[in-house]
Amino acid sequence: MAGKLKPLNVEAPEATEEAEGQAKSLKTEDLLAMVIKLQKEGSLEPQIEDLISRINDLQQAKKKSSEELRETHSLWEALHRELDSLNGEKVHLEEVLGKKQEALRILQMHCQEKESEAQRLDVRGQLEDLMGQHKDLWEFHMLEQRLAREIRALERSKEQLLSERRLVRAKLREVERRLHSPPEVEGAMAVNDGLKAELEIFGEQVRSAPEVGAGEGEAGPELPRARDEEDPEPPVAAPDAL
């Protein structure tokens, strides 16, 4: 019970007994006054039966009042016991209510902590996903840069090889021209022998140039082979044919 129980408005047995005693005294005084009056009038005898009847009525009324008083006293005690019991039950219910409210508060705090932890885990998972995506993009960018550097290096090597190849071909054409030209001075045979030796060296350089290009092509991605249309490679004559 939430409110305080109000005390019952029941009169105490002592007050009831006092009221009953006063009524009894008044009735006794009335009887004495009646007896004295009858004695003076000389008519006491005819009124004895009436007096006895009234006394019996008073005794019955007294007995009934005593029984009502005992019942009232018993009811008063029972109501007070019930009031004490209800007060005790009220205290017990207030204690239970306090415990339930404390348990509810703890449960709400626990739920809030769980929700906060779930939000932190969600944010952490999203952050890890973003970091993973950023790492993949960074690795792809680094790979792209490395491949671009390798491609530029291969292109420079290709240009260098083409330049060397054109230079060697020019030297070969010069040597062949000199070999096929008629001798004009003495000692032309010695010059031809030197030119043949130089031609052999240039031929070896020409044959080794494609091998170097093929070796570098294995290290990096395959590039389209450029065709030197301006300076086609002439057939190299064998030294013995000269």
Swiss-Prot record:
It comes from the Eukaryota. Signal peptide: none annotated. Keywords: Coiled coil, Meiosis. Residues 1-24, 206-242 are annotated as: Disordered. The keyword Chloroplast does not apply. InterPro entries: SYCE1. GO terms for biological process: synaptonemal complex assembly. The keyword Coiled coil applies. Residues 44-181 form a coiled coil. GO terms for cellular component: intermediate filament cytoskeleton; synaptonemal complex. Belongs to the SYCE family. May be involved in meiosis. This is Synaptonemal complex central element protein 1-like.
